[in-house]
């Protein structure tokens, strides 16, 4: 039990010692910066082709399947 607590304590303290800001390493920080880490499926909102999953393209404001390659 003491080993587990020590390990967790090291995980909490280590980022502050290395100088890395916690918001740069967490999903909540990604949400604050607007980074999503996931892609949009068919019919979901997009701004660029890279926002869409797989072979979907951003057609207007939603991801759609197209027979021609994305731009």
Swiss-Prot record:
Transmembrane segments: none
Keywords assigned by UniProt, alphabetized: Disulfide bond, Secreted, Signal, Toxin
GO CC term, one of those recorded: extracellular region
Annotated tissue distribution: Expressed by the venom duct.
Span of the signal peptide: 1-19
Main location: secreted
Propeptide: 20-47
GO molecular function: toxin activity
Domain of life where this protein originates: Eukaryota
Cysteines joined through disulfide linkages: 39-53, 46-58, 52-63, 57-70
InterPro entries according to UniProt: Conotoxin-I_CS (IPR013141)
Compartments, record wording: Secreted
Domains: entry comment: The cysteine framework is XI (C-C-CC-CC-C-C).
Family: Belongs to the I1 superfamily.
Protein name: Conotoxin Tx11.3
Organism of provenance: Conus textile
Upper lineage: Eukaryota, Metazoa, Spiralia, Lophotrochozoa, Mollusca
